[in-house]
């Protein structure tokens, strides 16, 4: 696969809209969903050693304290790490206090990216939450604000009622769930697409014969093949593991490129089915 990846060689994408001008997000991030707080020190610490410079946590994950401990280490340059956290559904009407609590756990004065975790449409207060997020950005407390799991009608409503779209939308995305209509809306409006559950492990994507065959062709693992697919679609992609070897493996996706027929084969895997909750009903 060629030269080993370093953090300096990881590509970045520009965040627009509700962002500090010129803010860049590394295209590969390290997610800590389902990582116990006590395990974050080792996993995130190892990720930093390997070269990750983008960490994704959330209040509901229960491990912001662990992320904060690592960020506070003397050998970690806070300005060198892009930090994301999220507001949970029960705090849509309490965003400033929720933000303060997260910042206290993270030990930060300024956050890079704050996200609404789910639209929770039955509550019907996500526009209020978005307005509060924009206020935090205007106050200089967060460099960029965005959302997770918003569908086109949710995004359109934010635009109609506030005039400002998110800089990024973090969504469930994989070759088995390609969300073409939503990604087209993102592209049209300058919203960065960020993928969670990018490997669709629960759906068996890594054992799919097409993925296995293409991985063998490029002499990479099925996971590396799929993560590379995300990068070539200009997505930000979140990896997740507590296993040192797997953390390293997931980072080594920049030493090869997919061919047009590879992309065509992967495009044909779309099933349109989710492994996670439905954003139109969850929350």
Short names for language-model regions:
Residues 36-47, 92-106, 155, 178:
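Short, acidic/polar
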Residues 22, 96-116, 135-139, 160-161:
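CE4/NodB-like, metal-dependent polysaccharide N-deacetylase domain
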Residues 6-15, 65, 71-72, 97-101, ...:
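Alpha-helical scaffolding within the catalytic cores
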Residues 78-91, 112-119, 149, 173:
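A short, structured active-site edge motif that brings together acidic residues
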Residues 1-81, 132, 265, 281-282:
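N-terminal binding-site loop/beta-alpha segment at the start of enzyme catalytic domains
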Residues 119-283:
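Beta/alpha (TIM)-barrel catalytic core signal, keyed to glycine-rich beta->alpha loops juxtaposed to Asp/Glu
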Residues 52, 108-111, 142, 166:
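A structural motif
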Residues 35-38, 58-66, 88-95, 121-124, ...:
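Acidic-and-aromatic substrate-binding clefts and catalytic sites of carbohydrate-active enzymes
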């Amino acid at each position: 696969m060629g030269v080993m990846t370093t953090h300096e060689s990881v590509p970045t994408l520009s965040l627009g809209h509700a962002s500090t001008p010129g803010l860049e997000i590394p295209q590969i991030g390290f997610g800590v969903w389902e990582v116990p707080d006590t395990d974050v020190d080792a996993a995130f610490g190892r990720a930093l050693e390997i070269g990750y410079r983008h960490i994704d946590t959330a209040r509901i994950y229960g491990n912001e304290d662990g992320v904060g401990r690592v960020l506070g280490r003397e050998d970690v340059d806070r300005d060198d790490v892009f930090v994301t956290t999220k507001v949970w559904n029960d705090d849509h009407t309490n965003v400033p206090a929720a933000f303060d609590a997260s910042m206290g756990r993270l030990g930060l004065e300024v956050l890079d990216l704050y996200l609404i975790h789910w639209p929770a449409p039955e509550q019907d207060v996500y526009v209020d939450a978005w307005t509060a997020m924009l206020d935090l950005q205007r106050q200089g407390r967060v460099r960029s604000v965005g959302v997770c799991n918003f569908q086109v009608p949710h995004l359109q409503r934010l635009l109609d009622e506030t005039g400002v779209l998110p800089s990024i939308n973090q969504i469930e995305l994989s070759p088995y769930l390609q969300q073409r209509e939503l990604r087209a809306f993102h592209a049209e409006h300058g919203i960065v697409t960020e993928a969670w559950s990018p490997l669709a492990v629960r759906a068996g994507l890594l054992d799919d014969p097409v993925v296995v065959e293409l991985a063998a062709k490029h002499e990479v693992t099925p996971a590396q093949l799929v993560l590379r697919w995300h990068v070539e679609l200009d997505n930000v992609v979140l990896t997740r593991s507590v296993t040192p070897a797997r953390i390293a493996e997931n980072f080594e996706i920049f030493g090869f490129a997919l061919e047009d027929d590879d992309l065509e084969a992967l495009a044909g895997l779309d099933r349109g089915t989710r492994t996670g909750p439905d954003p139109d009903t969850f929350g």
